């Protein structure tokens, strides 16, 4: 086995810390049914089945099989007869359960579900192609995926750096980054992929190489930033992208790439709806309300990265562009000119890890509490200490800086 393949396998199986629970170490956050249905519907609507005698479907991290079940269920009956389904996962129990689930529901469909590491598979195929004059790589017409979400702190800095080298990535690497690049290598020309990921790559420095790859190795069709919808139990802010396969690398561009975002609107009342994902079809700037009392602002526009292939992604609409122009005219300076800027804590961490009353909680003050700068501290040149005790926030932060990067506290 080559070193790249060994690396991919060890990264996906890594349990670096003895106290890290298996789902977190493996990144196995399974997909809610409504999100699986949403992604499957988008794939089927975008796919062109007319010229294909056989249709190969792939889930590279099959988990419990929910995504494949949703996708096959959405296919027209005449198409299902032409379908051959493939799924990989490093968890043997998950593979067995998914196989039983799918074969019972779709007895006429051929399933090839294997305990296999997808990254290892792609690297091996890539190395084999170097030794032959003609590519023997298996391509897939439809890919649906929710890749493992494992942060650098859990993978370990050394393995993350090796993954980056193997897949041509730069900076900090989360495990879903190489998954995205690997999907582009097995998606057939004119094939369709629908992928669920964290939305971190859209705005972080470490996501620069992934943003470029998405704009060069796919034909990106639509991006959904699902913001603080809290669709997952894990503290992950999800996103979905829909893309078409290409025959060769493209010049990076964002022309006509649709972009939808949904974020909670604290003070707005909106039209009532029972399904949070159904709100994604709302018009730009509409507010929708769901039964749990939350209200969401939906933005519909196009992807804007400022003309930079590695630039931060945002939704561009006529109203938002006018607002940004106004902000620009009244801007004294930007934070990046003053000091190094890091991404802040996601809103899903509020109330659980961020408090102003750590000294009063049962069991005493945790030893890993650190002071946190919030908007209440912000002022010109130097942060302030808020007058109100309730605004003096501290965060339970279980990581530390080391010579090789950030690491979890053991």
Regions found by a protein language model. Give the residues of each.
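Short, conserved SAM-binding/catalytic segment
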Residues: 98-109
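S-adenosyl-L-methionine
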Residues: 1-47
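Conserved class I S-adenosyl-L-methionine
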Residues: 53-61
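Conserved S-adenosyl-L-methionine
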Residues: 74-84
């Amino acid at each position: 086995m080559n070193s790249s393949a060994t690396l991919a396998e060890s990264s996906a199986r890594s349990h670096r810390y003895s106290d890290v629970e298996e789902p977190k170490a493996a990144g196995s956050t399974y997909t809610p049914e409504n999100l699986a249905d949403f992604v499957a519907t988008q794939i089927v609507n975008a796919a062109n089945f007319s010229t294909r005698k056989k249709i190969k479907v792939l889930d590279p991290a099959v988990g419990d099989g929910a995504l494949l079940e949703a996708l096959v269920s959405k296919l027209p009956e005449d198409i299902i007869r032409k379908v051959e389904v493939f799924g990989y996962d490093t968890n043997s129990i998950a593979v067995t359960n998914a196989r039983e689930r799918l074969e019972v529901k779709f007895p006429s469909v051929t399933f090839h579900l294997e305990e296999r590491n997808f990254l290892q598979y792609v690297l091996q195929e890539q190395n084999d192609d170097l030794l032959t004059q003609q590519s023997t790589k298996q391509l897939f017409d439809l890919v649906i995926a929710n890749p493992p979400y494992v942060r650098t702190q859990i993978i370990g800095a050394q393995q993350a750096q090796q993954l980056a080298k193997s897949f041509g990535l730069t900076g900090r690497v989360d495990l879903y980054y190489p998954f995205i690049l690997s999907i582009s290598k097995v998606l057939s020309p004119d094939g369709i992929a629908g992928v669920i990921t964290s939305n971190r790559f859209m705005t972080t420095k470490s996501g620069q190489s992934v943003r470029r790859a998405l704009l060069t190795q796919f034909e990106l069709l639509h991006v959904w930033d699902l913001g603080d919808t809290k669709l997952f139990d894990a503290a992950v802010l999800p996103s979905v992208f829909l893309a078409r396969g290409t025959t060769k690398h493209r010049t990076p561009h964002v022309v006509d790439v649709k972009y939808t975002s949904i974020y909670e609107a604290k003070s707005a009342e909106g039209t009532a709806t029972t399904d949070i994902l159904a709100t994604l079809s709302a018009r730009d700037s509409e507010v929708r309300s769901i039964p749990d009392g939350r209200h969401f602002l939906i933005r519909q526009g196009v992807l804007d990265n400022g003309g930079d292939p590695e630039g931060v992604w945002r939704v561009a609409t006529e109203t938002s562009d006018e607002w940004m122009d106004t902000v620009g005219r009244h801007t004294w300076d930007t934070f990046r000119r003053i000091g190094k800027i890091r991404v802040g804590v996601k809103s899903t961490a509020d109330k659980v890890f961020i408090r102003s009353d750590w000294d009063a909680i049962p069991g005493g003050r945790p030893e890993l509490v650190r002071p946190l700068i919030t908007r209440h501290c912000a002022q010109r040149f130097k942060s302030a200490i808020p007058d109100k005790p309730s605004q003096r926030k501290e965060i339970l932060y279980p990581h530390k800086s080391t010579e090789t990067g950030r690491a979890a506290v053991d």
